[in-house]
Amino acid sequence: MALKFHPLTSQSPKLPSFRMPQLASLRSPKFVMASTLRSTSREVETLKKPFMPPREVHLQVTHSMPPQKMEIFKSLEDWAEENLLVHLKPVERCWQPQDFLPDSAFEGFHEQVRELRERAKELPDEYFVVLVGDMITEEALPTYQTMLNTLDGVRDETGASPTPWAIWTRAWTAEENRHGDLLNKYLYLSGRVDMRQVEKTIQYLIGSGMDPRTENNPYLGFIYTSFQERATFISHGNTARLAKEHGDIKLAQICGTITADEKRHETAYTKIVEKLFEIDPEGTVIAFEEMMRKKVSMPAHLMYDGRDDNLFHHFSAVAQRLGVYTAKDYADILEFLVGRWKVESLTGLSGEGQKAQDYVCALPARIRKLEERAQGRAKEGPTIPFSWIFDRQVKL
């Protein structure tokens, strides 16, 4: 799972934020935890709270799904076994990172590495900023498995639970684990990046966690993962396209192979939400509205390298400029999910459900309109150093 820029949550002042009204029908009484804050002084904060995220985390809400909804997910276990697990590949049929990298046991290893590095020389620094950002996001996989295991009704209760939900989470994690491994090894061999700074960023990110605002609620959680897997599919697809344009066909193959995995995972998560719309259209459309009013925060939004408190914003700006992941992509994903789940054709909804339906169906056009206005006002971005590429300057 990866990703990036959100047109409505970036620190850029381009677009306004939408206010979220209180939604009640899907919610049980909330348990609220104090928000996590970081001082504006990074030096002071580093001394006081060295393991805190680089920016404020939202007020934490937990276990918002009413207990009676838990039975829905229990009743779906047979369905999940037949319809979800089919989107996993047996390990023996899966690709492995070594399939795409020089073989250190092979006599021609050093020559293969030289060839890889020669190809990498043709790629611009800005491309490596985006590729490193994608890799770091993939490497924070422990956080994403943790997030899935916070969801009521579907978590792995023991660490080796035999339920289809738990099997999916573990096997999905195992498949995703290859993505960060492959990109990490490629970047190490390329010689183009400061691996110690990259590794520090990974450690900071895993230590900071993520703040998806899914409230232990699988309705919100699976809507979030549906969105994220499609965003990752788009992002890796675009890094593959750019690698090919710069003449590195093997790197394009690496990124394209990861893209295919993300597409398969997207299909699985969207099927879960599709089933929820079939069983509980009212609750699901309200959850969809809530997730979109909150605005989908990207998994790596707490990214930090020990220097740049706005690292994720800067990385996202480069991804936007290169067309790797953009505000348009965000709107396109939302429009795709509205169509995939047939939200416009839902009937029999309450007044609250109809309002939620109207909101999510109108939102893609609204986002596009806001982005068009923002582009019209946009000024040329500054050039800043990125520690990942030895502090070389890249335009935002």
UniProtKB/Swiss-Prot annotation:
Disulfide bonds: none annotated. It comes from the Eukaryota. Keywords: Chloroplast, Fatty acid biosynthesis, Fatty acid metabolism, Iron, Lipid biosynthesis, Lipid metabolism, Metal-binding, Oxidoreductase, Plastid, Transit peptide. Signal peptide: none annotated. Binds 2 Fe(2+) ions per subunit. GO terms for cellular component: chloroplast. Fe cation 1 binds at residues 138, 176, 179, 262. Residues 1-33 form a transit peptide. Its cofactor is Fe(2+). One of its GO terms (molecular function) is metal ion binding. It is found in: Plastid, Chloroplast; Plastid. Fe cation 2 binds at residues 176, 229, 262, 265. Transmembrane segments: none annotated. Introduces a cis double bond in the acyl chain of an acyl-[acyl-carrier protein]. Homodimer. Belongs to the fatty acid desaturase type 2 family. This is Acyl-[acyl-carrier-protein] desaturase, chloroplastic. It comes from Cucumis sativus (Cucumber).
